[in-house]
Regions:
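Phosphate/diphosphate-binding glycine-rich loops and adjacent basic-rich segments that engage nucleotide
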Residues: 144-193
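N-terminal glycine-rich anion-binding loops that anchor highly charged ligand groups
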Residues: 1, 10-73
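A glycine-rich helix N-cap at a beta->alpha junction
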Residues: 123-149, 219-225, 229
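Short beta-strand segments
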Residues: 109, 143, 151-154, 184, ...
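Short glycine/serine/threonine-rich phosphate/pyrophosphate-binding segments
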Residues: 87-96, 100-101, 108-109, 115-118, ...
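Well-ordered secondary-structure scaffolds
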Residues: 5, 10, 15-18, 28, ...
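Short acidic, glycine/serine/threonine-rich loops at helix termini
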Residues: 92, 110, 117-122, 153-154, ...
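Active-site cofactor/substrate anionic-group-binding motifs, chiefly glycine-
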Residues: 49-110, 114
């Protein structure tokens, strides 16, 4: 078998066999196949696409290229969640303890933030002492003991995907749906979950800008789930404006703690309850969306989700006192408001501009390895559809020096557009696939 023949086959729009895909992935991972050949193949995939079976074979080959977690002792019950990334998306911090409090084990490996999309692990590390780099043995023992574990991707999961992603980044092949879907699902399958809830974000602050592309990606990932024997649901959710109010690590942690205490922004509340419900359906704890929502809300109302969150933080050596006293979390020295020049109805709150501004003030990374400031961030005080007055606060910017504020002032000011006519708020969700 030769790599060049496989490239020609895909160039000519033919379907690749399981053996051909395995050959490519295995030999690319070991360095036998050079970057330039895989780059040519990736471009052929971008231009000509892949069948669902091909994408599944690619996913499984990439999952098998490194460590694979065996969670079979949990009897097919472990459920995982993945978000394609957004601005202010602190959902995992609330959803994981809700679902675990309902008796369903949640074992999740999360990433760090890159670009304007925040990472769950960065938010958890705003809690002093929290240990996010667990070994396989620690991951499984904590899941066994507490029914919940959230860790960084310290294992060598799907190394073929890491190598391929680095190439896609510099060869114009990032936007290929088969390659995006196999990238996400290979890591999820390698991390051992039986059921996966996918939160596919759509809009200005998301990787997928339009509903058509997001829908296609969701359908492909659900198909991979079916063909690989996993239960998968994909929820399409709105990301034109940030989720909730807080953007920035300690600020988002504070908002998640508020939600677990029964308060918090409406859009974030709906998002957490619905995603929890879908996870409970996947884990066969709830028969339908309504009963799943009821179970999730009860876990918030009776305090069991908050208790489970404390258990998680304690089990991973974090300082639990910050959950009782969120004011102990890192805080910025300055809080500077940005106000509206005119009255009217909020037409746009540009999630990308808010996310990029948060990176510029130090809350996120422009490139891998950048050091982040846990304390800084942005509180978004308006939502699309709100009626506002001139002089009303649009944002509270949390910074440690005024210069940082000045670099983002104009971008944030223009990220909100105000209409003279009433504006209809957007739906929280655009649909669900796989249910």
């Amino acid at each position: 078998m030769r790599a060049v023949d496989i490239i020609i086959k895909k160039r000519d729009k033919q379907e690749l066999s399981k053996e051909e895909i395995s050959f490519l992935v295995k030999n690319f991972t070991t360095g036998e196949i050079p970057d330039y050949q895989i780059s040519a193949w990736a471009m052929a995939v971008l231009l000509n696409g892949m069948s669902h079976q091909e994408i599944t074979n690619l996913t499984m080959a990439m999952a098998a290229s490194g460590d694979q977690l065996d969670l079979s002792e949990f009897g097919g019950l472990v459920v995982d969640k993945h978000s394609t990334g957004g601005v202010g998306d602190k959902t995992t911090l609330v959803v994981a303890p809700i679902v675990a409090a309902c008796g369903l084990p949640v074992g999740k490996m999360s990433g760090r933030g890159l670009g304007f999309s925040g990472g769950t692990i960065d938010k958890l590390e705003s809690i002093p002492g929290f240990k996010s780099d667990l070994s396989t043995e620690e991951f499984i023992s904590k899941l066994r003991e507490h029914g919940i574990v959230l860790t960084g991707q310290s294992l060598d999961l799907a190394p073929a995907d890491g190598k391929l992603y680095a190439l896609r980044d510099v060869t114009g092949t990032v936007q290929s749906i088969p390659l995006i879907a196999s990238s996400v699902m290979s890591k999820k399958i390698a991390s051992g979950a039986d059921a996966i809830a996918l939160d596919v974000k759509v809009g200005r602050g998301a990787f997928m800008r339009n509903l058509e592309e997001a829908n296609e990606l969701a359908e492909v990932m659900v198909a991979i789930g079916k063909l690989s024997g996993r239960r998968v649901i994909a929820v399409l959710s709105q990301m034109d404006q940030p989720l909730g109010v807080a953007v920035g690590n300690a600020l988002e942690m504070k908002e998640a703690i508020e939600m677990l205490n029964g308060s918090g922004p409406d859009d974030f509340h709906v998002h957490c309850i619905d995603l929890s419900a879908y996870m409970l359906i996947l884990g066969k704890k709830a028969a339908d969306l309504e009963s799943g929502r009821k179970m999730a809300q009860e876990a918030l109302d009776n305090g069991s989700a908050l208790k489970k969150f404390k258990e998680l933080i304690q089990s991973q050596h974090g300082d639990v006192s910050v959950i009782e006293q969120p004011e102990l979390l890192p805080a910025a020295q300055l809080v500077i408001p940005i106000t509206a020049d005119s009255a009217g109805w909020v037409k746009v709150v540009d999630a990308q501009a808010v996310g990029e501004s948060s990176v510029e003030i130090g809350a996120g990374r422009a490139k891998k390895g950048d050091i982040i400031d846990q304390a800084v961030g942005i509180m978004v005080r308006v939502k699309v559809g709100d009626k506002i007055k001139a002089g009303q606060t649009l944002f509270d910017v949390h910074v440690n020096d005024r210069k940082a504020f000045e670099t983002v002032f104009q971008k944030l000011k223009t990220s909100v557009q105000i209409s003279e006519e009433p504006v209809e708020p957007p739906p929280y969700f655009w649909g669900v696939i796989g249910l």
